[in-house]
UniProtKB/Swiss-Prot annotation:
The lineage of its organism: Bacteria, Pseudomonadati, Pseudomonadota, Alphaproteobacteria, Caulobacterales. CDD domains: AdoMet_MTases (cd02440). NCBIfam families: MenG_MenH_UbiE. The gene is ubiE. The keyword S-adenosyl-L-methionine applies. Pathway: Quinol/quinone metabolism; menaquinone biosynthesis; menaquinol from 1,4-dihydroxy-2-naphthoate: step 2/2; Cofactor biosynthesis; ubiquinone biosynthesis. Pfam families: Ubie_methyltran. It comes from Phenylobacterium zucineum (strain HLK1). Its EC number is 2.1.1.163, 2.1.1.201. This is Ubiquinone/menaquinone biosynthesis C-methyltransferase UbiE. GO terms for molecular function: 2-methoxy-6-polyprenyl-1,4-benzoquinol methyltransferase activity; demethylmenaquinone methyltransferase activity.
């Protein structure tokens, strides 16, 4: 390896290779992506996502970025919440941009039905195809750990947010108790790849996804990275005793 390295599961690879490797994983799992999250979280991810949407509280007229938005699971929540608020008190339509590096994920999302507020775009979280200070909110769910250069993606999030804009990142994290960590490790490394092989015929992709969670920074370290990227009011909320965490901040 002659250039900068990046993590790909438990492997260290050339940073230039990681985007293609990650793209391959999501090419294979795109049609079963929501099933994948059900397996990774035992179905609890749906409650976590509802909590994120409630925290975001989308409003009429807002521009919301759903980065690494995949199949649009979160974007649809945001669009419908903003629409309900609009029905109550009027205002302009919200705009929700789903931006994902993987075209297969975008295609899977589009196939799930039309929502007038949602726009679909293939794009890189490290180089978003958007102008400065264009968004009221930036959300990334279960995606930041797959980015090659996480600090670059955080700086890019700061760039596209308006002053005071909201940053929300939902990601798998570290359980806060040792017994839960041991139980989660057992489930992750023994059960999830086996289910992935039986249900999707793809052990390798699910093994990568489990490993990528373990290589991701813990709650405090990732909160520090968000602050270093130029956000204020940085904090996090643990979900299910730290199996996942919602990280938040405000653009300065």
């Amino acid at each position: 390896m002659t250039g900068p390295s990046a993590t790909f599961g438990f492997r260290d690879v050339d940073a230039r290779e990681k985007p293609g490797l990650v793209r391959g994983v999501f090419d294979r799992v795109a049609r079963r992506y929501d099933l994948m999250n059900d397996l990774m979280s035992a179905g609890v991810h749906r409650l976590w996502k509802d909590a994120v949407a409630a925290r975001l509280n989308p409003q009429p007229g807002e521009t919301i970025l759903d980065v690494a938005g995949g199949t649009g699971d979160m974007a649809r929540r945001f669009a419908r919440m903003a629409r309900r608020a609009q029905e109550r008190r009027g205002g302009d339509d919200a705009k929700v941009f789903v931006i994902d590096y993987n075209a297969e994920m975008i295609a899977a999302g589009r196939e799930r039905g039309f929502e007038p507020e949602i726009c679909w775009t293939v794009g890189d979280a490290q180089r978003l195809p958007l102008p400065d200070a264009c968004a009221d909110a930036y959300v990334i769910s279960f995606g930041i750990r797959n980015v090659t250069d996480i600090p670059a993606a955080l700086r890019e999030a700061r760039r596209v947010l308006k002053p005071g804009g909201r940053f929300l990142c939902l990601e798998f994290s570290r359980p806060v108790t040792e017994p839960l960590q041991r139980a989660y490790d057992l489930y992750s490394f023994k059960v999830i790849p086996e289910i992935g092989e039986r249900v999707a015929g793809d052990r390798e992709s699910y093994q990568y996804l489990v490993e990528s969670i373990r290589r991701f920074p813990d709650q405090k370290r990732f909160a520090g990275m968000i602050g270093e990227a130029g956000f204020s009011r940085v904090g996090y909320t643990n979900f299910t005793a730290g199996v996942a965490a919602l990280h938040t901040g405000r653009a300065i």
